[in-house]
Amino acid sequence: MEVKGPSGRSFCCESEGQFKSCLKRHTPSLLLPSSWKGNSGSCLMAEALHRTSPTPNSCPLPLPLCRMSGVLCSRNLFTFKFSLFQLDSGASGEPGHSLGLTLGFSYCGNCQTAVVSAQPEGMASNGAYPVLGPGVTANPGTSLSVFTALPFTTPAPGPAHGPLLVTAGAPPGGPLVLSTFPSTPLVTEQDGCGPSGAGASNVFVQMRTEVGPVKAAQAQTLVLTQAPLVWQAPGALCGGVVCPPPLLLAAAPVVPVMAAQVVGGTQACEGGWSQGLPLPPPPPPAAQLPPIVSQGNAGPWPQGAHGESSLASSQAKAPPDDSCNPRSVYENFRLWQHYKPLARRHLPQSPDTEALSCFLIPVLRSLARRKPTMTLEEGLWRAMREWQHTSNFDRMIFYEMAEKFLEFEAEEEMQIQKSQWMKGPQCLPPPATPRLEPRGPPAPEVVKQPVYLPSKAGPKAPTACLPPPRPQRPVTKARRPPPRPHRRAETKARLPPPRPQRPAETKVPEEIPPEVVQEYVDIMEELLGPSLGATGEPEKQREEGKVKQPQEEDWTPPDPGLLSYIDKLCSQKDFVTKVEAVIHPQFLEELLSPDPQMDFLALSQDLEQEEGLTLAQLVEKRLPPLKEKQHARAAPSRGTARLDSSSSKFAAGQGAERDVPDPQQGVGMETCPPQMTARDSQGRGRAHTGMARSEDSVVLLGCQDSPGLRAAWPTSPPQDHRPTCPGVGTKDALDLPGGSPVRESHGLAQGSSEEEELPSLAFLLGSQHKLLPWWLPQSPVPASGLLSPEKWGPQGTHQSPSAERRGLNLAPSPANKAKKRPLFGSLSPAEKTPYPGPGLRVSGEQSLTWGLGGPSQSQKRKGDPLVSRKEKKQHCSQ
């Protein structure tokens, strides 16, 4: 027979007595070893928990994890009895703090191995074990290996409750590790917090050997009976995630109100034992007791720190020192996930959160063992102080552990998203994962719904069932701290928190609300005005259906011949100058000015006001600014050219006067020189030209909308269309450049061609009265009347033309001659002739120049004979 100690040493026992003596001799060292050295198979928590060296007499905490191995032969029946050390109030600080027991069984040939592990009670993690009594007696049977724990009295009051039943199958060839007592709460306090050991327990172990495969395995029954326990809230011990407020761990008066029946089953698998497999058959009914349901607290029990403290989690568990068990690693991983919020709360901006969470796992467990009444805040404060006093070299083990846990977490997220992606085509919502700590907002579930355009206030609907993109595995390498043990600075592990990737959402384009469209239409109508259709009705009526909208086929393009004719006219320079002659000079000046802020509306209003003015009011309005411009822009050379042109027009005008009989012809002959009595065809042509240009000047300067001046038109004789003096009313008198000798000859040469173009230009000249509403009327009013308002009668009608002629035939005054010389400079030879015609011409021209014919208008008038041709044609027909 062989007994193995915790250090791996073997003790040979040849007989039952020697085995008992070995047990007695090695029991203190087995339960409370003087030292603990973690081997390669132990986990980090085991190393942290076994840093102290307790002694049998004084038991400082934390208590170590112990293991005792013994070889029991089924052929030799013997009974051994050993006592577990139960701490008193002086050693532990809390009465009733006892040890737990873990029995492991294995079958090798005809031998069975029982592995007994002891661990202190009071842990909230998976390593918590109930109380084992001070005495255990094993009585193996002849045909059935039975370990019977003899009952004994317990100091704690309370009703007796039946034994707990744990049934398991022991396969041949592999160890069966069972948890002696489940971690499910058995007895609760009145406030639902904390257990403490209340007495001893009786353990009934019934075993039988399995023969054959696992399916035909013979049942082994382990009946465990224990005294009442007081369960402590796991959330308060393990990080405060479930129960954030600090919970007192003090032991309360034992009130046994619940005795649970737990059946934990495990089944052998390759590489370990799996959880959640079918349970073996239950024990005989005689060994079972109905559960007693608590009347004061029938609600759900709080989740443990690792989320496994439930009936389903009370199946077989590995011994605490078996660190290579995947189940213990998984539970530590869940503990680490729950400790991270606590670490972030104390180190919000530190990258050591993951490593600190790993450090809290053994520290909080040790503190819970040592002082169950310690609050959560006090435990965290002690843990943080211990972390600050830990060197970088000692922290390395926790950084490595955090690195592995980060890899587990990333792999878990990837598996969850992969499962969602696999279930995406079927459009089934993914099952809820048992994540106790939410890491960001959950991904929205993809539901297959028909695509539709939502209303204005309706929610958006997902359009299709799209699989979420496969996330990339984040890099979880932690930067190790520098090997500087003398520095106490915290080493920062650069571990970026993984971000959950959301599946792509297909957005449905929003429909434009009709209210917005109507508002846009109203704004455009307000800016552009209501559009009129071909029938002249507003656009609103057409929208209402009152007026039918014309079809696009009804629209006819303009005549291409007309367009080509307009292009041909615009290509001619003379046509362009003729069109410029009918444009208002002020409008043209404003249009050509470099000022970009030209107000067309104000200009149009000003022109409309001038349209309603009389001739005298118009002269009074425009005379002062024209005088200023005339002084600034007049040039002597231009005056000489105008005088020469006036002399030639004077002779042409006299020839026209002699050609037409008139009662007042004598008066006209007296005012004209005798050299111009003879005439020829050239003179007749000049007479007609002079008359036409005179009429042209009157048309361009006239305001036919004036009612006072229109009244005088029918009373005048037909011959009054011709001026009585060549210098009166001519274009040169108005200081227009069209009367120069060069322009006159050009007009004579182009006379016939222009007469042919007049009918085609009627559509362009039809609106000349609207464009030029401010000039003189188209009546034979002499230019001298512009500055002589006294010649108008009391009724607004003009005096007789003969009186005007007699007034104009008077000799020029010296004042007029004085004004002429500084204005025009030297006189031409034609002006020095003794006849008074040129003098009168200069006088009339001077008065008109001071009146309306400023030099500013000379730059914009180049082709005025356009309208005069029409008047010339009418005169020839007479």
UniProtKB/Swiss-Prot annotation:
Signal peptide: none annotated. This is NUT family member 2B. Residues 278-288, 427-444 have a biased composition (Pro residues). InterPro entries: NUT, NUT_N. Residues 476-487 have a biased composition (Basic residues). Residues 273-324, 417-512, 527-560, 624-693, 709-757, 775-878 are annotated as: Disordered. It comes from the Eukaryota. Belongs to the NUT family. It comes from Homo sapiens. Residues 537-551 have a biased composition (Basic and acidic residues).
